[in-house]
Amino acid sequence: MKENVPSTVVFILLLFLNISLLNGQSPPGKPEIFKCRSPEKETFTCWWKPGADGGLPTNYTLTYHKEGETFTHECPDYKTGGPNSCYFNKKHTSIWTIYIITVNATNQMGSSSSDPRYVDVTYIVEPDPPVNLTLELKKPEDQKPYLWIKWLPPTLVDVRSGWLTLQYEIRLQPEKTAEWETHFAGQQTQFKILSLYPGQKYLVQVRCKPDHGFWSEWSPESSIQIPNDFSMKDTTMWIFVAILSAVVCLIMIWAVALKGYSMVACILPPVPGPKIKGFDTHLLEKGKSEELLSALGCQDFPPTSDCEDLLVEFLEVDDSEDQQLMPAHSKEHPSQGRKPTHLDPDSDSGRGSCDSPSLLSEKCDEPRANPPKFHTPEGIEKPGDPETNLPRPQDPQSTSVESKLLYFHADGSKSSTWPLPQPPILHDPGSSYHNLADVGQLVLGTAGATAALLEKTDRHAFNPPKTTETGGEGRATEQKESESFHSKTDQGTVWLLPQDKGPFVSPKPMEYVEIHKVSKDGALALLPKQQENGDRPEKAGAPETSKEYAQVSRVMDNHILVLVQDPRARNVAPFEEPTKETPPSRPQNPAAKDLASFTTAPGHCRHPLGGLDYLDPAGFMHSFQ
């Protein structure tokens, strides 16, 4: 029994030893490549961390291959870079080429590999720290004192050829503080530090970085002691300026707080109110421009209307006392052939020229209908006898009978008449205007007129004078007959005016009549048109002025004027025509005899000019076409 005990203990001890040996041995762990660095972009080195060795000796190898290749290479140098590193010299380094690197670990129990690492030499550049760092305190006379720092690039980097470009950064701190003050210096190898505290010791370091890569390590520290007598005059001056500015700002704020309203009113004065008399600010605020303009006395825009809306149904009058007579008829055509020796100045003021004949013709082309008749009013004054009649020579070659001319009276203002377009059958294109005597030739009686009046009118209108009496005696006889004629007519009698020849058949141009003025009593003053008398001389004894007048007895419904003789026409010295040989009377135009009335369209042939209407006797003949 005692002999079996030692063998059992040895077995148990061997069993526990075998178990412990079996638990300590295993395959190696997975290694890790943690850094690859190139100090000058010509060579590079990679470092790795080994994994667990498994209790057995482990062997590490680094293999690589370039991108696009299948052949695998092993690390060319395991010693230059230190333990667990691989150094690639210039022969094995290529830029713009990607390296695929792997680390393998192997022992008796097995092997393991690291994750592949892709390396481009251009982007793994990490240069060495700058060298020869020096510090110097300078005190120039014209500038404030400063700390001058200088250094040199790393020895392995070729910066002269431009193969690698470095940027620098400086940091410094007082010895008794923990914070660093950093300054970027760029590509220069010197730098100035201005803000320094006297009596302090400063520690300075510098580092560098390429265009593509990483910052280098900080260079070894360099220190400098700032003396206590270090001048700070510039800083003291700026401090004084800052304090003074703060005091001035406080004073201004205090003044604005006390007298803010008055200062604002002084800097930004208020807009003065309107000082226009009668100006209402409330209307301006409400936006009522019409009431505002009316309050200021301004006129609004004139209303727009058609041409006929502006017609005015009255004539312009004045208080002139001049009386003029109509000229006697010529041998060729009524109102032609004799030039008046003297005429008053025309007061038409140019209104007639504003209406073109073409414009009037457009308005007068519409046909007239239902022509009204002229009626003589009751109580017509009898004309008086003329004072004197001056004879004038008669043209022996005359082919027409001298027209009988009535004497009219008026003391109103003068107004010009515009012509209306004439029918092409009745007159020559050269004829344009007619006097009042021609209008009288158109106003003929109808079948409703009394027989006695018709016979009397026909006698005066168509029968030539049988004797060669002087113009004065014939005129007196005419006036006497007219006086008896007016005394016999009543209000319902149709007026018949004499006519010597067919209406407007003369080839020569005709004249127009100017209405001089119309008085309050309805009297109408007429002015003849002054014309040249080239084919008939005047008698030496003719007066200088030739005037005839008519009196408006009444105005009918359609604005038709009824003209009567003026009893006061005898007091004016008229001019008389001499007796002349009268050719045998020729038959009157049947169309002129049958026409007994005419029509006028009120406001149809008028055009407003300054508030006046123009009366054109030529418009009376439009219905005789």
Curated annotation (Swiss-Prot):
InterPro entries documented for this protein: FN3_dom, FN3_sf, Growth/epo_recpt_lig-bind, Ig-like_fold, Long_hematopoietin_rcpt_CS, Type-I_Cytokine_Rcpt
Residues exposed to the Extracellular side: 25-237
Compositional bias ranges of the Basic and acidic residues kind: 329-349, 375-385, 475-489, 532-547
Transmembrane feature ranges: 238-258
Location of the region described as Disordered in the Swiss-Prot/TrEMBL record: 325-423, 455-492, 524-548, 571-601
Protein's membrane topology: Single-pass type I membrane protein
Sugar-bearing residue positions: 59, 104, 132
Segments on the Cytoplasmic side according to the record's topology features: 259-625
Keyword Zinc listed: yes
Signal peptide as annotated in the record: 1-24
Superkingdom of origin: Eukaryota
Short motif (Box 1 motif): ranges: 267-275
Residues covered by the Fibronectin type-III domain: 27-128, 129-229
Oligomeric and partner information: Interacts with SMARCA1. Interacts with NEK3 and VAV2 and this interaction is prolactin-dependent.
Protein name, entry field: Prolactin receptor
Source organism: Sus scrofa
Encoding gene, per UniProt annotation: PRLR
